[in-house]
């Protein structure tokens, strides 16, 4: 499952669980985006924070794992590079790429789109009432699903934190605590940065 996960919320987790059940998946690998090419001018939380929040959120489900491949690759993240690397790591696996239906609608603009269909089956998930369309996409390469919990959005969660409103029950408890501890989404610099080991680096502070 690819995504910015800024922050990860219960909608992501329910969507992953529903897709896993429908397609009898053995494992769901969450792949936090390193540097999204579509959001190159948008302020997002540092990759280490997004990675750690994803680890925290998925820890209790033995079917869920988290991969750093997009974060560690460097440069802009393209789905084709993600899938090529996953294919190299798991050559015998049948890959399903889970993404938001809104992102899937833009897939024809993605890098090396013709190769994508040979690497994975794409599953577009959306909230009820959102128009789903697979126009222009190969019928045997794409599935669409509605997931009620996707009425939660990362954008709304960030806005609530910025306004001092609670995000309990919208995101997992451990993620709430991580956001609070590191003061994410309360300032342009998103609080404190983390190094590759998950250790805090002060940003604009004399001490902590």
Swiss-Prot record:
It catalyses: nicotinate beta-D-ribonucleotide + ATP + H(+) = deamido-NAD(+) + diphosphate. Gene3D superfamilies: HUPs. Pathway: Cofactor biosynthesis; NAD(+) biosynthesis; deamido-NAD(+) from nicotinate D-ribonucleotide: step 1/1. It is an enzyme of class 2 (transferase). It holds the Pfam family CTP_transf_like. GO terms for biological process: NAD biosynthetic process. Its EC number is 2.7.7.18. Keywords: ATP-binding, NAD, Nucleotide-binding, Nucleotidyltransferase, Pyridine nucleotide biosynthesis, Transferase. GO terms for molecular function: ATP binding; nicotinate-nucleotide adenylyltransferase activity. Catalyzes the reversible adenylation of nicotinate mononucleotide (NaMN) to nicotinic acid adenine dinucleotide (NaAD). Belongs to the NadD family. PANTHER family: NICOTINATE-NUCLEOTIDE ADENYLYLTRANSFERASE-RELATED, PHOSPHOPANTETHEINE ADENYLYLTRANSFERASE. This is Probable nicotinate-nucleotide adenylyltransferase.
């Amino acid at each position: 499952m690819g995504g910015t996960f800024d922050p990860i919320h219960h909608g992501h987790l329910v969507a992953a669980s529903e897709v896993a059940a429908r397609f009898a998946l053995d494992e769901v690998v969450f792949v936090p985006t390193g540097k999204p090419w579509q959001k190159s001018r948008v302020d997002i939380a540092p990759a280490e924070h997004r990675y750690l929040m994803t680890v925290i959120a998925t820890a209790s489900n033995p079917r869920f794992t988290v991969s750093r491949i997009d974060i560690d690759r460097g440069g802009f993240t393209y789905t084709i590079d993600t899938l090529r690397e996953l294919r190299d790591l798991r050559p015998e696996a049948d890959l399903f790429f889970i993404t938001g239906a809104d992102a899937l609608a833009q897939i024809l603009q993605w890098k090396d789109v013709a190769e994508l269909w040979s690497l994975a089956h794409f599953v577009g998930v959306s909230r009820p009432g959102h128009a789903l369309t697979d126009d222009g996409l190969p019928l045997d390469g794409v599935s669409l699903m509605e997931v009620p919990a996707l009425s939660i959005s990362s954008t709304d969660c960030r806005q609530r934190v910025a306004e001092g409103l609670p995000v309990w029950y919208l995101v997992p408890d451990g993620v709430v605590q991580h956001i609070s501890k590191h003061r994410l989404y309360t300032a342009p610099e998103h609080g404190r940065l983390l190094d590759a080991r998950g250790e805090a680096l002060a940003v604009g502070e004399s001490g902590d």
